[in-house]
Amino acid sequence: MRAMSAIFLLLVLSLPACGPVYHSPDLGDLYSELAQREDPYRNPIIVIPGLLGSKLVDQKSGAVVWGAFGLGQVDPNTKTGARLVALPMGKGKRLAELRDSTASDGALDRVVFNFLGFPVELNAYYNILRTLGVGGYRDQGLGEAGAIDYGDRHFTCFQFDYDWRHDIAESARELDRFIKEKTRYVQEETEKRFGIKLAEVKFDIVTHSMGGLVARYYVRYGGADLPDDGSLPELTWAGARHVDHLVMIGPPNGGSLDAFLNLVNGVSPATLFPHYPAAVIGTMPAVYQLLPRSRHRPLLDDQGRPPPDIYDPDLWQSNGWGLADPDQKKVVKMLLPDIASPEKRREIALDHQRKALLRAKQFTAALDLPANPPPSLRLLLIAGDAEETKKTAQFDSRGRITVKETGPGDGTVLRSSALMDERVASELKTRLVSPIQWDQVLFVFSDHLGITKDPAFTDNLLYFLLESPRED
């Protein structure tokens, strides 16, 4: 009996050593033939980065507002730096009319730290470009910069850079113009190289984080703006006419609690970076458009009750959040140097916050409207669900906030937010309820940045783009 017990114990102890060994796929072997094929009918790719994924430069001074890190970087705690980083404010003006001299100037690729609660996806963006390179896509930005010599071969991958501070619907309209421009380029190159006149060009779009919201608005509404009266635009799927595949990597479709926390508190990206005050961040409409939905109960008062509307300006003013925080008056003074009266400056700041909140409410309602996309548009979600991610916060009578609950996600975006899951906890026995009709969903056990490093991400993305069946 002892001998049998010893043998059994030995077998049990040896089981882990006999377990399966997982290997990463040989992507070159899998996709090299497809990648090397010159196919005039292969869809070109547009890559859209998310928050902070584009370099920002002041057109007047040449100063790099975002994208120069270390010595010489713009400090948002100085008068000049604060006004460069923040967007202008002005009472009686629409958000779209509040312009400064800063513009996007290309995409970034390799900076990694946390900002606004979102790990900067710049490294993730590089990994996306590297993956597409394996698939044989020739990137215009890399080619024109001389980073890669493609010879005389035409470009099949385009980086869409944009000012990520602005209203996301505005960025979607810029995307509409960008796609029209690249359509003409692809048509001209295809006729020149293959003698084929393309009547239309369909693109595949790959997005990361907030870039997914830019693309989602575009495929739904094309270049249409949000109406000034607060109503929703007509859902035409105008942009979907130019898109076959839309890949969204870690998109905050249902918002992120981190966006709320950093609008309230400001943020210090990393040890070597300056603090970005709440008033500076509060000038950026896009950040409000990343707020979580009230119906998902991300916020509770000191009695455990959810406020009816997270976009209610009175809620923010009564709790002294963001631009409404009296402690931000010094920053507001730096942002409005021509306004002598403290009362007038506060009036302008509160007006800006109100406009940004109402615009965000309108924008998210436009995205959340349930609708079936055209059959030709296929949607792929790649998200993380193995990291604890902020889910619920509670505020006391003085407006102070404490995170109370976490949930599965990628450390930045909840699984439920990426899916745009409308189920409440008591309904999780039912199948997914979402206004987004996903064609394919892939969960990766990585954080917000690590998703694009995972071999499963690379393999599945290339299959989806290169091999998956398409509508004729």
Give the positions of each predicted feature.
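Positively charged n-region of N-terminal signal peptides that target proteins for export
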Residues: 1-5
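Generic alpha-helix initiation/capping and coil-helix boundary signal
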Residues: 7, 120-121, 349, 353
